[in-house]
Each structure stands twice: as structure tokens, then as C-alpha cells.
């Protein structure tokens, strides 16, 4: 996968040199290039200006973004604008982006964008219902969530299939050694070696956590007969 990032602050992306994303780059599975669009600004390197019609704040000018975009070697990229008014990013969106060969992220700053910049864009995406100073942190979050889904980046596909949201449910509790730590012990079922009972316990705990913390996820989740029975028991125990 090739990712190009248009930003005023390339140095903010140093975390992408480490961990899973960094390893993907080392393996040659990922190429990330940064483009400081201030370098393409014509008016004394000014990238922003006052909005027509008045109003508070400054807008990113179209010219530096367009010229930086035109300079990128590309074929058929997915172009993502980080915008609080965009569609909310989620695991399904990450899975969709992971299928692409080319991504371009446009990271804004200031009050907003000249609307004409959006003619370059295929996707306007937001992390959530809050406003960040710029798009850089949002872009890094989306890149991390997307890159880890690329085949061969993590290794076993099952490593991320059990993650929260990948299955549609929140992830079940997990434990490692020692068995007893400060009086907190590992559930006996996980020590039993009985694979079917362990599967049932994990499914029950996933449903329980999802029902308690993110019941909205269950509105779009297709329950199996087994899951319906478990969820009914969970609700009954909560009453």
C-alpha cells in the first residue's frame, strides 16, 4: 500500500516509524510519503486566508493543496479529507480502506477548507463528534487502524479478527500468567482445556461487555440462536 499525506506538520508523524506500521514499512508492505503543502504556497508561503463574506478564523487556500496534490505520483487513489463534518470512522471503514492500493490523506488546520478543495476528495471522514486542532492525529489513528488489517502485516489473520468491533462485538476479557495475581485469579474455564466451554465463555463475555458498554452495536448485529439465549440470560441477570 502507498500512502501520501498532505500536511503542514510532517514531523508529527514520527510515531508511524514504530510498532506495527513501522514494521510494515520495513517489510516493504507500506510506503508512506509526506508532503508539506506550505512548500507549494505562492503568496509568501501563506497557506490560509480570510473567508469571503466575513466570519471568524482562517481557511486553507485551495492553491497549495491542489499544487501539492498534482505533484504526487498516483494512479487511482482514495483521497481522504479529515473533517469534523465527515462520515464517522469505524472498524468497517478501516477494513474498506485496507483493500486499497493508494490512499491520500489531506490534513487540515485553522478554521476549515476552501470548499473547492473537496473536488479532489473521495471521502470526508471524522474520528467523532469533537474538534481537533488539525487532521494529523486523526490521520495517524486511521492509518494505524487500516495498516494492521493489510495481509501479512500482523501475521495470522485471526490475530485481528477477534479484536473489538471486528466481529461486531466488544472483545472478551483475556488473561496471561500468573494464574493468581494479588488475589485476582484466572477464571477456571480458561484453565480447563475444554475448547467448546472456552468458546462459549468468550462469546458470553463479549455479549455481556457489549450490552453493558455499547448496546448500540447490538442494534446492527445479527444474533445467532445461541447468542439470543445468552443475551436473554445477560439481561435477566441485570434486572
Swiss-Prot record:
The keyword Protease does not apply. InterPro entries: Alpha/beta_knot_MTases, tRNA_m1G_MeTrfase_C_sf, tRNA_m1G_MeTrfase_TrmD, tRNA_m1G_MTases_N, tRNA_MeTrfase_TRMD/TRM10. SUPFAM superfamilies: alpha/beta knot. Pfam families: tRNA_m1G_MT. GO terms for molecular function: tRNA (guanine(37)-N1)-methyltransferase activity. The keyword Methyltransferase applies. S-adenosyl-L-methionine binds at residues 108, 127-132. Its EC number is 2.1.1.228. It is found in: Cytoplasm. GO terms for cellular component: cytosol. Disulfide bonds: none annotated. It catalyses: guanosine(37) in tRNA + S-adenosyl-L-methionine = N(1)-methylguanosine(37) in tRNA + S-adenosyl-L-homocysteine + H(+). It comes from the Bacteria. One of its GO terms (biological process) is tRNA N1-guanine methylation. Keywords: Cytoplasm, Methyltransferase, S-adenosyl-L-methionine, Transferase, tRNA processing. Belongs to the RNA methyltransferase TrmD family. Specifically methylates guanosine-37 in various tRNAs. Homodimer. This is tRNA (guanine-N(1)-)-methyltransferase. The lineage of its organism: Bacteria, Bacillati, Bacillota, Bacilli, Lactobacillales. The gene is trmD.
